[in-house]
Regions:
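Active-site-adjacent structural elements in enzyme catalytic cores
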Residues: 1-216
Length: 216
């Protein structure tokens, strides 16, 4: 009966804490998410979306302290480490996903064959609050069936997605829509591979002194 008095945000947090899958707003689009350490929930997300299992799931964090839960901060030999820190200082929180070495023992659905995971510090107040109250980073893949357009208005959420999750938090402010987050992989001092152009213009990266390598 106590659950009847829960706010929509409370329900989303409880679902995430209990290992469920949720839909929630981010600064770009609505996201489909779960705790990063729950392999079963991550597999559910892949199934709900019809997403290729070989495609890693991106992650958001609610504050910088949560970065250590998803990224291997001891990867001292990684040549992109200094550049990654500079990117974070310049552009986080914001719609910039940075590809980083994944922390050991996390589910394989999060990382690619090189052991890298895409992470961003979200500025969206509701997404941040869910991460902080659930005490974990969250998967943040777009809440759409694979191959379909992402949604910034929950009214257009696919029935397949809605039926497959444990909670939908509509939240305010609504996602901005437009473009997904920009994704970059730091490879050397002030040198980044642009994996996906997006909401943070690559020209902004260049103006801050980062050398850009476009992917083919």
């Amino acid at each position: 009966m106590a659950h009847e008095k829960e706010s929509p945000l409370d329900r989303a947090v409880r679902a995430a804490v209990n290992g469920g899958c949720i839909v929630y707003p981010t600064e770009t689009f609505y996201a489909l998410g779960a705790k990063i350490g729950n392999a079963e929930a991550l597999e559910r997300i892949i199934g709900i979306k019809g997403r290729p299992g070989s495609k890693p799931l991106p992650v958001i964090i609610g504050n910088m302290a949560q970065l250590a839960q998803v990224a291997d901060e001891n990867a001292r030999a990684w040549p992109g480490l200094k550049c990654a820190r500079e990117l974070m200082e310049c552009f986080w929180p914001g719609p910039l996903s940075i590809v980083l070495p994944v922390r050991k023992a996390l589910p394989p659905q999060l990382s690619d064959a090189q052991g890298l995971v895409s992470v961003r510090l979200t500025p969206h107040p509701a997404a941040r609050e869910i991460c902080l109250r659930a005490k974990t980073p969250l998967v943040a893949t777009s809440a759409n069936v694979s191959g379909k357009a992402p949604v910034s208005d929950v009214r257009f959420l696919s029935p397949t997605i809605r039926a497959g999750v444990d909670a939908v938090f509509e939240g305010e402010p609504r996602p901005a829509g437009g473009l997904a987050s920009t994704v970059v992989k730091p490879v050397a001092d002030q040198e980044v591979v642009v994996c996906r152009a997006g909401a943070l213009p690559v020209e902004t990266l260049a103006r801050q002194g980062f050398r850009l390598i476009e992917t083919p």
